[in-house]
């Protein structure tokens, strides 16, 4: 079981080397991350984008493009389509976003002709290495689904569980976190949490243990759980935090990064291959970890 993000680099190296297809690769932070991943032996890369800019960035930043295939395409919409096409044709295993809008890339991924549209919902899964926590902490969904209903949360959980399984966490503990840890008919998030827990107990959601509603405090602190008299397999030992909406996930994730000094990695799940998105605000390590995470999952 992977307990620290730095361990996923070695895990990725032990697995079969994958090929990453980068859409609109003419972006300095993305090129730096991809070159580092190639140097580390995690991936080979296909760069789709403005070749002149790609080569110029590499020269200015002393980046070794080595044997990477570069496909010259200045139009970002066409670059996204070509990057996706490489995966559809089996020439690459997964996709990374470069210098283009997320919606542009996902439109290409979900194009019916591309063949990468999955059967379910796209959701964002972040993995945090928090110094104050005893293992990796997964957070979902703070990036894709604004206000998920119960049926959406089932798919969001399943997507996160797939990521946990890829990191050799066999039976991840899922905490649907809410403002309170009791079912309140006036608070939909608590009703959804209770339903998810019951569905898990009856085998409708497999591969994990779900217990909720739980407050954030008792989801990650056994002392807080004991103080409130909560007896739970998940309390104080959560692997996956399921947030009620995108705002909660966004705020919590950024709090872990900026106040908790956490390092992170993230992917979009739900298509036939993972999609790696990195923020300009991410550290170089986080970008590298995201590429490694995508390689392990794909």
Language-model regions, residue ranges each:
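Anion-binding alpha/beta catalytic cores of soluble intermediary-metabolism enzymes, centered on
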Residues: 1-47, 51-234, 239-243, 248-298
């Amino acid at each position: 079981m992977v307990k620290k993000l730095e361990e996923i680099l070695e895990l990725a190296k032990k697995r079969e080397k994958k090929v990453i297809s980068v859409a609109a690769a003419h972006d300095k932070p993305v090129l730096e991350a991809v070159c580092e991943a190639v140097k580390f032996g995690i991936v080979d890369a296909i760069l789709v984008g403005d070749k002149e800019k790609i080569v110029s960035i590499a020269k200015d930043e002393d980046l070794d493009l080595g044997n990477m295939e570069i496909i010259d395409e200045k139009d970002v919409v066409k670059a996204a389509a070509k990057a996706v096409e490489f995966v559809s044709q089996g020439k690459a295993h997964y996709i990374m976003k470069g210098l283009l809008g997320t919606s542009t890339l996902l439109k290409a991924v979900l194009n019916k002709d591309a063949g990468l549209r999955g059967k379910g919902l796209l959701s964002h899964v972040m993995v945090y290495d928090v110094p104050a926590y005893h293992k990796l902490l997964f957070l979902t969904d703070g990036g894709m689904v604004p206000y998920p209903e119960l049926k959406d949360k089932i798919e969001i959980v399943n997507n996160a569980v797939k990521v946990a399984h890829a990191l050799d966490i066999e039976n991840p503990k899922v905490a649907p976190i809410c403002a309170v840890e009791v079912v309140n008919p006036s608070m939909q998030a608590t009703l959804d949490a209770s339903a998810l827990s019951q569905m898990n107990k009856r085998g409708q959601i497999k591969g994990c243990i779900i217990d909720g509603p739980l407050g954030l405090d008792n989801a990650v602190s056994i002392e807080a759980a004991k103080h409130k008299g909560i007896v739970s397999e998940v309390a104080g030992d959560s692997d996956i935090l399921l947030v009620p909406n995108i705002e909660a996930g966004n705020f919590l994730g950024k709090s872990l990064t900026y106040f908790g000094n956490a390092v992170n990695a993230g992917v979009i799940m739900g298509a036939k291959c993972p999609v790696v998105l990195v923020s300009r605000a991410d550290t170089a390590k986080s970008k590298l970890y995201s590429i490694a995470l995508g390689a392990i999952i794909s």
